């Protein structure tokens, strides 16, 4: 039994679903990239604080709109978010290690999602080509029928 070719309307609907998935995935990627930059900035701050004693300057935000002059109350210590709203005061080496693991996990997640986005983009392109071929074929068929009727 021959498989019936999907209609242009069905392919267009599939294309829209793929576009929606691509847009959603791009949003998730943007959020993960923001989280990655945040973790990287936190790691850099902890690394900088590790060797400081007394007053030092710290960035107030990633874009350096503000720089804060601060005195470390406990040099060599950092309070790090462990997840689920749990924080721990750790030595800076352990804090840096935890942040590095978070950074690696985010990078792996980003890579996986980018691969998925590439796959979806290729699928989108294939569906688009199929839709264009079908609509071109239908247009040619209609033109042929009109010529027959005109003769």
Curated annotation (Swiss-Prot):
CDD domains xref list: Prefoldin_alpha
Main location: cytoplasm
Top-rank taxon, per record: Archaea
Coiled coil: none
Gene Ontology cellular component annotations, sorted alphabetically: cytoplasm; prefoldin complex
GO BP terms in the entry: protein folding
Alphabetized Pfam families for the sequence: Prefoldin
Gene Ontology molecular function: any one: unfolded protein binding
Disulfide bonds: none
The keyword Chaperone belongs to this UniProt entry's keyword annotation: yes
Recorded family membership: Belongs to the prefoldin subunit alpha family.
HAMAP family noted in UniProt: PfdA
Name the UniProt record assigns to this protein: Prefoldin subunit alpha
Organism annotation: Aeropyrum pernix (strain ATCC 700893 / DSM 11879 / JCM 9820 / NBRC 100138 / K1)
Lineage: Archaea, Thermoproteota, Thermoprotei, Desulfurococcales, Desulfurococcaceae
């Amino acid at each position: 039994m021959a498989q019936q070719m999907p209609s242009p309307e069905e392919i267009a609907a599939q294309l829209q679903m793929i576009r929606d998935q691509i847009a959603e995935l791009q949003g998730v990627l943007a959020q993960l990239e923001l989280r990655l930059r945040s973790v990287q900035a936190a790691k850099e701050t902890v690394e900088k604080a590790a060797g400081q004693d007394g007053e030092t300057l710290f960035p107030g935000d990633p874009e350096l709109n503000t720089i804060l002059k601060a005195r470390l109350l406990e040099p060599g210590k950092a309070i790090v978010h462990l997840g689920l709203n749990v924080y721990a005061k750790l030595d800076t080496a352990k804090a840096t290690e935890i942040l590095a693991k978070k950074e690696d996990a985010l990078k792996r997640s980003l890579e996986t999602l980018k691969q998925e986005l590439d796959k979806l983009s290729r699928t989108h392109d294939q569906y688009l080509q199929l839709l264009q071929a079908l609509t071109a074929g239908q247009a040619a068929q209609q033109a042929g029928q009109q010529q027959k009727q005109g003769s």
